[in-house]
């Protein structure tokens, strides 16, 4: 085709003759194609490209791309054709002008066939055919590389062409000779179009394959990460760290060996063998290090061929010195943990040998240590849990008994006003007058002073020490009781009550701290009940003694109770943790020797305390008070405050403080002092019932039971007092107030008594638990003050029935508060609770709760 350009440009007049012949044949071929294939011309301005490549725009009909057009209507299709050709990738084009088109003259049939189109073409007479020399020169030009230029011009001509053809549906049948002439061109076009469609489909499939591949790789990486994370918490690994901690001489050595151990565990997930899921792994017999390492991987990991099935990673072979079966070890570990935490098995247990004889070794010490992971990822080791030392129960019982005597004094002081106010307001016994308003202050000033004592107790236990702070409350307790016993006016009574309340606030904060830092975890559950039990004993003792003594003699008894408490406090040491916090390592060692036994190896536990204190010092610079006001912390703080509010405004302290007066006003046929004793006994035993049921029924179930019981009893009590004042005679129902009070105390002790304090430690975030607990405790004391101070005013203004109905209505609102806002925390870890409450978690993992590793990859 480019040869024609050369001839037309440089041939002069004679050179135009072959070009005219070629153009004539081209027009003739165009006419023949249009007739035989059933196409008609839409545009009259045919592009006369020398290469004639525009004829490639004669597209066969495709039902998926072009609509059917009837013979009568032939709309222009130039825009759609041009856009279609521009969007498609460039294809290879070939000229339609063949050698036989040049050498073969047109037939008369072809010359007579007109081109059916909207615009006619004027056909010129056919020129003579080209000579053989011109044909040879044309072929030489094609061989010298003119095809590339022709192809480029063909593409440009194709893009700029505005010629479009539509299929004309005619009934005329074409001759077999015309079909044979055009079959090669049509087949070539169909082949190119099919190839293009295949190429496009392949491109789409390629993108989908890449997307699926990325998804598969992402899932595989996620499974590997989860596997590594779970492997690091394996029980066998924890036991290794336990032995490692005892053998390490420094913190750096422990961390170094720990990293090496974790590296060994993570090698079981080496990517070199992770994807070889289609091979059966067997040990290697070669001596090279690399093959030996691979054999070790294969020996440690047992993977199924299907990666969707659960993968069990057995780490029992990580410790070369341990050849105990993993399942047996796991069962043994669970038994040890159950024994150490079950209060019903608190008696001394012994291991049995194969013959069933006692070995004489206490196995409760086998509980692993609690490992806390701080926010920066470093391990925080609390008081060293595992020890081979026997548990010297008597020394720790002595320490717990000493501080629990302080709790007995607290209970006695709290219940003092209930039996004492009856005789104190009697002018035949008291030399000074105690008005109703003064009596309300006698009962209400103690919780107000307890609020101040709780705030002051926090700094005191840090500066003076836990033991010294508790010891410092003994003498003020004695002085406060003597002030009340020797009082000659109401002011002395109020001063004594205020001083006693201040000591109560300090003791309520420092007693549990001392027990938590001195008693071993194996007996902490049992000994931790002593303060609560002794507090209830103090309340019962006050009720019993108050039935036989007046307010002055009862105060003298209260002054005598702190004396054994004071003596025993001199016998016990300060907590080792406080000594470590002050840098007194030697004194901490002596304290541990006293608590654990002279022959005990206390060095590992002492090192654990020092590490824990170092971590606490790093966190001490953070201002946690500002964290209380963040939005994410307001929900758990509000729930704790709400529980404390409904606990106190259920009227419990009003009932405890004014039990005798309430029974006198009720006109019960049972002696009022006997009624208070019965209430004290019920309160004592109901506390232990709540402890037994709280982990079996759940927190919310017990809160429901407690709230419903208090609502019913308070409503019945209100109705009883209303009928007594305004309605029919109820003297024959003298047993009803005592029955209601017993059920009321029982319901309170099951739920709203212990659970608000328990849930305060569960739902408050770890980062703000200290300051938040102080705020909640102070709020509890404030509510106690309001209830006890205003109870007599309420009964005077609304009547006893109005006060009890008010408390019942508050309990009714509290029931809906529990249903809507209070979460269930039974069986959940602190991480799960914090994640649910705040949406984030601070990792605090106890390996005692870890189950054998089995997870899905």
Swiss-Prot record:
InterPro entries: MFS_dom, MFS_ERD6/Tret1-like, MFS_sugar_transport-like, MFS_trans_sf, MFS_Trehalose_Transporter, Sugar/inositol_transpt, Sugar_transporter_CS
Region span, Disordered: 1-28, 62-203, 327-346
Glycosylation sites: 428, 550
Membrane-topology descriptor: Multi-pass membrane protein
Biased amino acid composition, Basic and acidic residues: 134-143
Main localization of the protein described in the UniProt heading: membrane
TM region positions: 393-413, 441-461, 474-494, 498-518, 529-549, 553-573, 637-657, 674-694, 701-721, 741-761, 771-791, 802-822
Domain of life: Eukaryota
GO annotation terms (biological process): D-glucose transmembrane transport; trehalose transport
A GO CC term assigned to this protein in UniProt: plasma membrane
Summary of the function given for this chain in its UniProt record: Low-capacity facilitative transporter for trehalose. Does not transport maltose, sucrose or lactose. Mediates the bidirectional transfer of trehalose. Responsible for the transport of trehalose synthesized in the fat body and the incorporation of trehalose into other tissues that require a carbon source, thereby regulating trehalose levels in the hemolymph.
NCBIfam families: SP
Matches recorded under PANTHER family: FACILITATED TREHALOSE TRANSPORTER TRET1-1-RELATED (PTHR48021:SF96), PTHR48021
Protein name per the record: Facilitated trehalose transporter Tret1-1
Source organism of the structure: Drosophila simulans (Fruit fly)
Lineage: Eukaryota, Metazoa, Ecdysozoa, Arthropoda, Hexapoda
This protein's encoding gene: Tret1-1
């Amino acid at each position: 085709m480019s040869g024609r350009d050369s001839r037309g440009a440089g041939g002069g007049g004679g050179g135009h003759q072959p070009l005219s012949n070629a153009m004539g044949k081209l027009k003739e071929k165009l006419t023949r194609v249009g007739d035989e294939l059933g196409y008609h011309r839409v545009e009259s301005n045919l592009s006369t490209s020398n290469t004639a490549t525009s004829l490639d725009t004669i597209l066969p009909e495709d039902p998926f791309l072009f609509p059917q057009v009837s013979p009568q209507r032939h709309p222009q299709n130039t825009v759609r054709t041009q856009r279609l050709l521009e969007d498609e990738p460039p294809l290879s084009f070939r000229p339609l002008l063949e050698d036989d088109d040049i050498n073969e003259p047109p037939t008369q049939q072809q010359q007579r066939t007109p081109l059916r189109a909207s615009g006619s073409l004027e056909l010129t007479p056919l020129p003579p055919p080209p000579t053989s020399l011109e044909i040879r020169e044309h072929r030489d030009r094609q061989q010298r590389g003119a095809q590339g230029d022709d192809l480029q011009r063909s593409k440009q001509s194709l893009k700029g062409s505005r010629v479009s053809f539509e299929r004309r549906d005619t009934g005329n049948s074409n001759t077999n000779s015309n079909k044979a002439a055009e079959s090669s061109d049509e087949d070539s076009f169909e082949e190119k179009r099919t190839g293009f469609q295949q190429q496009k489909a392949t491109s789409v499939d390629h993108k989908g394959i890449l997307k699926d591949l990325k998804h598969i790789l992402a899932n595989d990486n996620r499974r590997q990460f989860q596997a590594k994370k779970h492997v690091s918490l394996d029980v066998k690994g924890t036991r290794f760290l336990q032995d490692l901690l005892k053998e390490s001489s420094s913190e750096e050595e422990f961390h170094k060996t720990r990293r090496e151990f974790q590296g060994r565990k993570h090698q079981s997930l080496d990517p070199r063998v992770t994807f070889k899921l289609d091979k059966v792994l067997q040990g290697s017999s070669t001596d090279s290090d690399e093959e030996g390492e691979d054999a070790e991987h294969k020996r440690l990991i047992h993977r199924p061929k299907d990666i969707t099935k659960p993968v069990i990673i057995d780490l029992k072979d990580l410790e070369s010195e341990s050849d105990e079966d993993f399942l047996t070890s796991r069962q043994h570990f669970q038994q040890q943990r159950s024994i150490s935490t079950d209060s019903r098995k608190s008696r001394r247990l012994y291991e049995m040998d194969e013959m069933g004889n006692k070995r004489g070794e206490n196995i409760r010490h086998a509980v692993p240590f609690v490992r806390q992971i701080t926010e920066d990822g470093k391990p925080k080791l609390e008081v060293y849990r595992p020890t081979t030392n026997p548990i010297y129960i008597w020394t720790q019982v002595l320490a717990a008994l000493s501080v629990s005597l302080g709790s007995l004094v607290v209970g006695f002081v709290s219940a003092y006003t209930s039996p004492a106010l009856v005789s104190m307001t009697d002018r035949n016994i008291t030399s000074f007058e105690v008005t109703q308003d003064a009596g309300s202050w006698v009962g209400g000033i103690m919780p107000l002073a307890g609020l101040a004592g709780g705030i002051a107790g926090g700094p005191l236990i840090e500066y003076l020490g836990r033991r010294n702070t508790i010891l410092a409350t003994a003498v003020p307790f004695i002085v406060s009781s003597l002030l009340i016993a020797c009082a000659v006016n109401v002011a002395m009574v109020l001063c004594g009550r205020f001083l006693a309340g201040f000591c109560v606030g300090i003791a309520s904060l420092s007693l549990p701290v001392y027990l938590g830092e001195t008693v071993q975890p194996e007996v902490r559950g049992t000994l931790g009940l002593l303060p609560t039990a002794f507090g209830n004993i103090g309340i019962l003792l006050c009720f019993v003694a108050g039935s036989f003594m007046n307010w002055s003699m009862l105060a003298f008894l209260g002054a005598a109770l702190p004396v054994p408490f004071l003596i025993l406090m001199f016998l016990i040491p300060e907590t080792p943790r406080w000594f470590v916090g002050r840098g007194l390592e030697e004194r901490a060692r002596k304290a541990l020797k006293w608590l654990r036994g002279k022959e005990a190896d206390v060095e590992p536990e002492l090192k654990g305390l020092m590490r824990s204190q170092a971590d606490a010092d790093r966190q001490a610079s953070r201002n946690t008070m500002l964290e209380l006001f963040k939005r994410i912390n307001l929900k758990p703080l509000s729930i704790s405050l709400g529980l404390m509010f409904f606990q106190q405004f259920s009227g419990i302290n009003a009932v405890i403080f004014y039990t005798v007066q309430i029974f006198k006003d009720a006109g019960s046929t049972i002696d009022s002092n006997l009624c208070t004793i019965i209430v004290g006994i019920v309160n004592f035993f109901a506390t232990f019932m709540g402890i037994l049921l709280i982990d079996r029924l759940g927190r919310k179930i017990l809160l429901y039971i407690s709230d419903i019981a208090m609502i019913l009893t308070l409503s019945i009590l209100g109705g009883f007092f209303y009928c007594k004042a305004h309605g029919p005679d109820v003297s024959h129902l003298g047993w009803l107030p005592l029955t209601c009070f017993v059920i009321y105390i029982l319901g309170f002790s099951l739920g709203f008594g212990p659970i608000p304090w328990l849930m305060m430690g569960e739902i408050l975030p770890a980062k703000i638990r200290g300051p938040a607990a102080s705020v909640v405790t102070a709020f509890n004391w404030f509510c106690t003050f309001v209830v006890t101070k205003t109870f007599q005013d309420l009964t005077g203004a609304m009547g006893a029935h109005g006060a009890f109905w008010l408390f019942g209505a508050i309990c009714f609102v509290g029931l809906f508060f529990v249903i809507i806002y209070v979460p269930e925390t039974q069986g959940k870890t602190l991480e799960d609770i914090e994640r649910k409450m705040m949406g984030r978690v601070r990792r605090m993992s106890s390996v005692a709760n870890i189950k054998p590793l089995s997870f899905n990859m």
